Amino acid sequence: MILQPETRRSRFPRICVMILLGLLPMAIFAHQIHAKEEGAQAATTWIVIRHAERAGNADQLTDAGNRRAELLKQLGTAIRTTAIYSTDYQRTRETVTPLAEKTDVAIQIYSPGKLDWLQQAQSEHVGGVIVIVGHSNTTLPIVEALSGYQAKPIGHDEYDRLFLLQTGTAEPTCLELRYGESSAGAPSADAA
Protein backbone atom coordinates (compact mmCIF):
# COMPACT_ATOMS: atom_id res chain seq x y z
CA MET A 1 0.00 0.00 0.00
CA ILE A 2 1.35 3.43 -0.93
CA LEU A 3 0.74 6.11 1.66
CA GLN A 4 0.16 9.59 0.36
CA PRO A 5 1.02 12.56 2.55
CA GLU A 6 -1.97 14.47 3.77
CA THR A 7 -2.59 17.57 1.76
CA ARG A 8 -4.15 20.75 3.02
CA ARG A 9 -7.29 19.76 1.14
CA SER A 10 -7.55 16.30 2.73
CA ARG A 11 -6.93 17.66 6.26
CA PHE A 12 -9.63 20.33 6.05
CA PRO A 13 -12.63 18.05 6.79
CA ARG A 14 -10.78 16.48 9.73
CA ILE A 15 -9.92 19.88 11.14
CA CYS A 16 -13.55 21.01 10.82
CA VAL A 17 -14.76 17.90 12.64
CA MET A 18 -12.20 18.38 15.41
CA ILE A 19 -13.27 21.99 15.86
CA LEU A 20 -16.93 20.95 15.92
CA LEU A 21 -16.21 18.21 18.46
CA GLY A 22 -14.40 20.74 20.63
CA LEU A 23 -16.84 23.64 20.45
CA LEU A 24 -20.20 21.88 20.35
CA PRO A 25 -20.13 20.52 23.92
CA MET A 26 -19.13 23.93 25.26
CA ALA A 27 -22.00 25.65 23.46
CA ILE A 28 -24.56 23.09 24.62
CA PHE A 29 -23.47 23.15 28.25
CA ALA A 30 -23.14 26.95 28.34
CA HIS A 31 -26.74 27.22 27.16
CA GLN A 32 -27.93 24.69 29.76
CA ILE A 33 -26.11 26.51 32.58
CA HIS A 34 -27.59 29.84 31.43
CA ALA A 35 -31.09 28.33 31.38
CA LYS A 36 -30.67 26.91 34.90
CA GLU A 37 -29.43 30.28 36.21
CA GLU A 38 -32.54 31.97 34.87
CA GLY A 39 -34.81 29.23 36.25
CA ALA A 40 -35.96 28.39 32.74
CA GLN A 41 -36.48 24.93 31.35
CA ALA A 42 -33.24 23.58 29.91
CA ALA A 43 -33.12 23.27 26.15
CA THR A 44 -33.17 19.82 24.61
CA THR A 45 -30.56 19.18 21.93
CA TRP A 46 -31.35 16.89 19.01
CA ILE A 47 -28.99 15.41 16.44
CA VAL A 48 -31.02 14.08 13.52
CA ILE A 49 -29.28 12.15 10.75
CA ARG A 50 -29.90 9.70 7.98
CA HIS A 51 -28.36 6.25 8.41
CA ALA A 52 -24.77 5.83 7.21
CA GLU A 53 -23.72 4.39 3.83
CA ARG A 54 -24.97 1.04 2.66
CA ALA A 55 -24.26 -0.86 -0.56
CA GLY A 56 -27.21 -0.65 -2.97
CA ASN A 57 -30.27 -2.20 -1.35
CA ALA A 58 -28.27 -4.17 1.23
CA ASP A 59 -29.25 -3.45 4.81
CA GLN A 60 -25.78 -3.55 6.38
CA LEU A 61 -23.33 -0.66 6.38
CA THR A 62 -20.34 -0.43 4.06
CA ASP A 63 -16.83 0.37 5.29
CA ALA A 64 -17.58 4.06 4.67
CA GLY A 65 -20.79 3.66 6.67
CA ASN A 66 -18.92 2.09 9.56
CA ARG A 67 -16.43 4.98 9.54
CA ARG A 68 -19.33 7.45 9.67
CA ALA A 69 -20.89 5.50 12.56
CA GLU A 70 -17.57 5.75 14.42
CA LEU A 71 -17.50 9.51 13.84
CA LEU A 72 -21.06 9.78 15.17
CA LYS A 73 -19.89 7.84 18.24
CA GLN A 74 -17.17 10.43 18.84
CA LEU A 75 -19.56 13.34 18.41
CA GLY A 76 -22.33 11.77 20.50
CA THR A 77 -19.93 10.88 23.28
CA ALA A 78 -18.45 14.40 23.34
CA ILE A 79 -21.86 16.01 23.78
CA ARG A 80 -23.05 13.41 26.31
CA THR A 81 -25.91 11.72 24.49
CA THR A 82 -28.79 10.82 26.82
CA ALA A 83 -31.17 9.09 24.37
CA ILE A 84 -30.87 7.31 21.04
CA TYR A 85 -33.75 6.58 18.65
CA SER A 86 -33.60 4.40 15.55
CA THR A 87 -35.98 2.73 13.16
CA ASP A 88 -35.97 -1.07 13.27
CA TYR A 89 -33.73 -1.55 10.25
CA GLN A 90 -30.24 -3.02 10.41
CA ARG A 91 -28.66 0.01 8.68
CA THR A 92 -30.11 2.51 11.15
CA ARG A 93 -29.29 0.39 14.19
CA GLU A 94 -25.71 -0.18 12.91
CA THR A 95 -25.31 3.59 12.51
CA VAL A 96 -25.95 4.24 16.22
CA THR A 97 -24.73 0.97 17.78
CA PRO A 98 -21.13 2.21 18.35
CA LEU A 99 -22.53 5.30 20.11
CA ALA A 100 -24.96 3.23 22.18
CA GLU A 101 -22.21 0.87 23.27
CA LYS A 102 -19.79 3.69 24.14
CA THR A 103 -22.34 5.73 26.12
CA ASP A 104 -24.28 2.77 27.56
CA VAL A 105 -27.52 4.31 26.26
CA ALA A 106 -30.13 1.86 24.96
CA ILE A 107 -31.37 2.27 21.40
CA GLN A 108 -35.10 2.96 21.39
CA ILE A 109 -37.00 1.87 18.29
CA TYR A 110 -39.56 4.18 16.68
CA SER A 111 -41.93 3.76 13.75
CA PRO A 112 -40.74 5.86 10.78
CA GLY A 113 -44.28 6.50 9.55
CA LYS A 114 -45.43 8.30 12.70
CA LEU A 115 -44.17 11.37 14.54
CA ASP A 116 -46.29 11.23 17.72
CA TRP A 117 -43.40 9.64 19.66
CA LEU A 118 -41.40 12.89 19.37
CA GLN A 119 -43.52 14.64 21.99
CA GLN A 120 -42.98 11.80 24.46
CA ALA A 121 -39.23 11.80 23.73
CA GLN A 122 -39.15 15.56 24.36
CA SER A 123 -40.89 15.24 27.73
CA GLU A 124 -38.78 12.25 28.83
CA HIS A 125 -35.45 13.86 27.96
CA VAL A 126 -35.87 17.56 28.79
CA GLY A 127 -32.45 19.19 28.81
CA GLY A 128 -30.84 16.09 27.33
CA VAL A 129 -29.12 15.27 24.07
CA ILE A 130 -31.16 13.03 21.77
CA VAL A 131 -29.74 11.33 18.67
CA ILE A 132 -32.24 10.19 16.03
CA VAL A 133 -31.29 8.17 12.96
CA GLY A 134 -33.74 7.85 10.09
CA HIS A 135 -33.89 7.48 6.33
CA SER A 136 -33.67 9.78 3.30
CA ASN A 137 -37.46 10.17 3.30
CA THR A 138 -38.10 10.28 7.08
CA THR A 139 -35.31 12.47 8.49
CA LEU A 140 -36.64 15.79 7.19
CA PRO A 141 -40.20 15.36 8.53
CA ILE A 142 -38.65 14.83 11.99
CA VAL A 143 -36.52 17.98 11.62
CA GLU A 144 -39.52 20.00 10.47
CA ALA A 145 -41.78 18.68 13.25
CA LEU A 146 -39.22 19.65 15.90
CA SER A 147 -38.04 23.00 14.56
CA GLY A 148 -40.14 24.12 11.60
CA TYR A 149 -36.98 24.10 9.45
CA GLN A 150 -37.60 23.02 5.86
CA ALA A 151 -34.46 21.61 4.26
CA LYS A 152 -33.93 20.54 0.68
CA PRO A 153 -34.63 16.82 0.13
CA ILE A 154 -31.94 14.31 1.03
CA GLY A 155 -30.61 12.52 -2.04
CA HIS A 156 -30.42 8.74 -2.07
CA ASP A 157 -26.63 9.02 -2.19
CA GLU A 158 -26.34 11.63 0.60
CA TYR A 159 -25.29 10.36 4.01
CA ASP A 160 -23.32 13.25 5.50
CA ARG A 161 -26.07 15.69 6.48
CA LEU A 162 -26.52 16.31 10.18
CA PHE A 163 -29.22 18.48 11.71
CA LEU A 164 -28.45 19.99 15.11
CA LEU A 165 -31.60 21.30 16.77
CA GLN A 166 -32.53 22.85 20.09
CA THR A 167 -36.06 22.86 21.45
CA GLY A 168 -37.47 24.06 24.74
CA THR A 169 -36.29 27.59 24.02
CA ALA A 170 -38.42 30.56 23.00
CA GLU A 171 -37.69 29.74 19.37
CA PRO A 172 -36.55 26.27 18.23
CA THR A 173 -33.33 26.39 16.25
CA CYS A 174 -31.81 24.19 13.56
CA LEU A 175 -28.31 24.14 12.18
CA GLU A 176 -27.68 21.98 9.12
CA LEU A 177 -24.14 20.57 8.98
CA ARG A 178 -22.13 18.00 7.06
CA TYR A 179 -20.06 15.45 8.93
CA GLY A 180 -17.46 12.90 7.93
CA GLU A 181 -16.43 12.14 4.38
CA SER A 182 -18.45 13.89 1.67
CA SER A 183 -21.19 11.71 0.24
CA ALA A 184 -21.28 11.00 -3.49
CA GLY A 185 -24.23 13.33 -4.01
CA ALA A 186 -23.09 16.04 -1.64
CA PRO A 187 -20.95 19.08 -2.31
CA SER A 188 -17.57 18.65 -0.66
CA ALA A 189 -16.95 20.63 2.51
CA ASP A 190 -13.54 21.58 1.13
CA ALA A 191 -14.55 22.24 -2.47
CA ALA A 192 -12.92 25.27 -4.00
Tell me the role of every PLM-derived stretch.
Residues 2-4:
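Cytosolic-side transmembrane helix boundary signature
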Residues 6-19:
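Bacterial N-terminal signal peptides that target proteins for export
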Residues 18-27:
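Bacterial N-terminal signal peptides
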Residues 29-126, 139-192:
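Active-site-proximal alpha-helix that buttresses catalytic centers in soluble enzyme cores
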Residues 129-131:
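Noncatalytic modules at the cell exterior or secretory-pathway interfaces
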Residues 133-135:
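Short beta-strand segments
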